[in-house]
Amino acid sequence: MAEIKVKLVRSRIGASPAQRKLLDSLGLKRREMVKTFKDTPAIRGIIAKVPHMVAVVE
């Protein structure tokens, strides 16, 4: 299975509580933090909910 890297590009300050929970589920706590995940529909769905805050790094 392929892997993707997700980077937090915008601060969590000002984000709604629901968006913060999504970022918590990804483990992204600080700006510029990068995590690697298996490319699953669940992870893609979380990324789709906060596209303005995260970027997929190749």
UniProtKB/Swiss-Prot annotation:
Keyword Phosphoprotein in annotation: no
CC terms in the record's Gene Ontology section: large ribosomal subunit
Domain of life: Bacteria
Keywords of this entry: Ribonucleoprotein, Ribosomal protein
Disulfide topology: none
UniProt signal peptide: none
A single GO BP: translation
Recorded GO MF terms: structural constituent of ribosome
Stored Pfam families: Ribosomal_L30 (PF00327)
InterPro entries xrefs: Ribo_uL30_ferredoxin-like_sf, Ribosomal_uL30_bac-type, Ribosomal_uL30_ferredoxin-like
Keyword Ribosomal protein listed: yes
Family: Belongs to the universal ribosomal protein uL30 family.
Matches recorded under HAMAP family: Ribosomal_uL30_B
Description of how the protein assembles with itself and partners: Part of the 50S ribosomal subunit.
Protein name: Large ribosomal subunit protein uL30
